Regions:
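Charge-rich amphipathic alpha-helical interaction elements
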Residues: 1-114
């Protein structure tokens, strides 16, 4: 492999290493928001009950319609988008490394055949 090709592989490895913390944080944020969404719904349903909505269906409707719940959903959307963006960048870097491994293996086999 050319020196430039090897440099690209090290860049891919460095990318994975350098972005692992950001990916972990994005994933943690997404998981937190998924669970917080449930807590927020419960809190909003309780507030709806106190406001006089006695059935669970009415409480749920009020919770889903609440602007605070919608804000949680928007934050979850952003968190999922960031997590997926980082994940696919990681997958691309891993694929570059796998291609390099395959090419290097083929190169070694060719050398043995000569």
């Amino acid at each position: 492999m050319t020196e430039e090709g090897e440099i690209q592989i090290f860049r891919a490895l460095n990318f994975i290493r350098d972005n692992a913390p950001a990916y972990a944080k994005a994933k943690a944020e997404r998981i937190y928001l998924e669970n917080f969404r449930k807590s927020k719904k419960a809190l909003l349903m309780r507030a709806a009950e106190i406001a006089g909505h006695k059935s669970a269906a009415l409480q749920e409707r009020e919770a889903y319609a609440n602007a605070e719940y919608v804000d949680v959903l928007k934050a979850l959307q952003v968190a999922v988008e960031e997590e997926e963006r980082l994940r696919w960048l990681m997958v691309a870097a891993e694929a570059r490394i796998e291609v390099w491994r395959t090419l290097e293996s083929s190169r070694r086999i060719e050398k043995k055949m000569i």
